[in-house]
Regions:
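Conserved loop-alpha-helix segment in the C-terminal half of the alpha/beta-hydrolase fold
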Residues: 181-220
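Conserved HGGG/HGGXW glycine-rich cap/lid loop of the alpha/beta-hydrolase fold
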Residues: 1-38
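Flexible "cap/lid" loop of the alpha/beta hydrolase fold
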Residues: 78-82, 89-120
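Post-His helix in hydrolase/transferase enzymes
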Residues: 217-231
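Gly/Ala-rich beta-loop-alpha elbow adjacent to hydrolase catalytic centers
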Residues: 69-77
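Conserved alpha/beta-hydrolase catalytic His-Asp/Glu region
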Residues: 102-103, 118-175
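Conserved acidic catalytic loop of the alpha/beta-hydrolase fold
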Residues: 47-65
């Protein structure tokens, strides 16, 4: 199993879920610019991120795998499936961004949370709010601290990734997918309003509502593990 994390998190977001899937060899990769991966310059695209992930898998000599992606990780997963479908045994997308170009342009104008360094330290409260209120860590201080630290580390990289996301067509990419697919999303996930597109794009996909706001793999890990195992038994 290969796991691709959301922005601005890191592969740490999958530790709980992976612990519930001991029967599988699981690999969670830090996307370039996140976690412990090196930064990359310029204006990388989703295609670039996908190719970096494939380079890692090639170095590990992994030729076939179940692919799981969350938010931006789901976008990268779609690119990988579209271009290297023979490698993908199954595709699981959590909170995939199935917005139209018009919807993305509107969201782009409304997305304004900034945690670039400020002399007065106010950016630290901004990122604390991001982790707790927006992502959904809430009163779980350990989770909130982890997500805060991941976000601070990825402050520049998050902007790169968001720019890449605005310019990638997840709807068209999902339509092109061939692998057996499981699509999950929490009702309070920021991507939930677009979930109806999943059925229109892939009527044969299994679509399930889960819990956990934007941190489902942490906050609804047991349920996701059950759904994932049931899904894999069917394919």
């Amino acid at each position: 199993m290969v796991f691709l994390h959301q922005t601005p998190s890191s592969s740490l977001m999958y530790e709980k879920l992976i612990s519930l899937l001991p029967q599988y060899t699981s690999i969670a990769i830090d996307t370039p610019g996140f976690g412990m991966s090196d930064d990359i310059p310029g204006n990388p695209t989703i295609e670039d991120y996908g190719n970096y992930i494939l380079e890692v898998l090639d170095n590990l000599e992994i030729e076939e795998f179940h692919l799981i992606g969350h938010h931006s990780g789901a976008s990268i997963a779609l690119y990988i499936e579209n271009h290297y479908s023979k490698m993908i045994a199954s595709l699981t997308l959590i909170g995939v961004f199935l917005a139209t170009t018009e919807e993305k342009n509107l969201m782009k104008k409304q997305t304004g949370l900034d945690w670039s360094p400020k002399e007065d330290g106010s950016h630290l409260m901004n990122v604390w709010k991001l982790a707790g209120d927006i992502l959904g860590a809430g009163e779980d201080l350990n989770l909130r601290q982890r997500e805060t630290l991941d976000a601070i580390r990825a402050e520049v990289s998050a902007k790169q990734m968001h720019d890449a996301i605005w310019n990638f067509n997840e709807i068209e990419a999902l339509r092109k997918t061939k692998a057996p697919s499981l699509i999950l999303c929490s009702e309070d996930d920021v991507m939930y309003p677009f979930l109806n597109q999943a059925i229109e794009c892939r009527s044969d996909a299994i679509v399930e509502t889960i819990q956990g706001k934007n941190l489902e793999p942490d906050l609804d890990a047991t349920n996701i593990a059950v759904l994932l195992m049931e899904f894999l038994k069917k394919i």
